[in-house]
């Protein structure tokens, strides 16, 4: 039994060390921009395999004040209307997701806020299970502890996936509309926000087999809601 205790101890030490790494990494992002994310690295590997390090993805960091208010409002309206007020998660949405997942017998809905989405994008995989969800909540707490809402939103807009190998709002603006993130119109912003649940499908039809989103209808709904969106300015 001694070896079981040893293995358990090693596991606990490993888990604690991982949390310390996440904690210190997020603290550094108060002043340093993340150079990459788990999703970016996974996409590089998917596209290029062993040529991972030389595989380009489209991404260019832009400061928060260089990003159009239209896309900020569109993303808030689409993804997390109460972003500026909640502590990183919404209990009602999580409980609703829990009930739906119990009915389906598996995780099909996450009830994720923008901060939770960022936690997943930065550090975790797209795998759906309760252990990963627990880690996501821990990272969400760390993000909200160290970073203010504007910084969280800035990192999110510069890191989120917007197509095949397309990450961040500047790359998305250039890729789809041949413009900069600072010049996105209301219509363009609404279309980009509509793409967020299924960015690869929005980019290329070959990824749409299991996607059931009418991007045009969703964009029109987002455009109508943008005026009520509250930004972390």
Curated annotation (Swiss-Prot):
Catalytic reaction equation(s): [GlcNAc-(1->4)-Mur2Ac(oyl-L-Ala-gamma-D-Glu-L-Lys-D-Ala-D-Ala)](n)-di-trans,octa-cis-undecaprenyl diphosphate + beta-D-GlcNAc-(1->4)-Mur2Ac(oyl-L-Ala-gamma-D-Glu-L-Lys-D-Ala-D-Ala)-di-trans,octa-cis-undecaprenyl diphosphate = [GlcNAc-(1->4)-Mur2Ac(oyl-L-Ala-gamma-D-Glu-L-Lys-D-Ala-D-Ala)](n+1)-di-trans,octa-cis-undecaprenyl diphosphate + di-trans,octa-cis-undecaprenyl diphosphate + H(+)
Domain of life, source organism: Bacteria
Top EC group: transferase
Cellular component terms (Gene Ontology): peptidoglycan-based cell wall; plasma membrane
Pathway noted in the entry: Cell wall biogenesis; peptidoglycan biosynthesis
Any Gene Ontology biological process: regulation of cell shape
Membrane topology: Single-pass membrane protein
Membrane-traversing stretches: 4-24
Keywords assigned: Cell inner membrane, Cell membrane, Cell shape, Cell wall biogenesis/degradation, Glycosyltransferase, Membrane, Peptidoglycan synthesis, Transferase, Transmembrane, Transmembrane helix
GO molecular function annotation: pentosyltransferase activity; peptidoglycan glycosyltransferase activity
Pfam family, one: Transgly
EC number assigned by the record: 2.4.99.28
Subcellular location: Cell inner membrane
Function: Peptidoglycan polymerase that catalyzes glycan chain elongation from lipid-linked precursors.
Family label: Belongs to the glycosyltransferase 51 family.
Record's protein name: Biosynthetic peptidoglycan transglycosylase
Native source species: Cupriavidus metallidurans (strain ATCC 43123 / DSM 2839 / NBRC 102507 / CH34) (Ralstonia metallidurans)
Encoding gene per record: mtgA
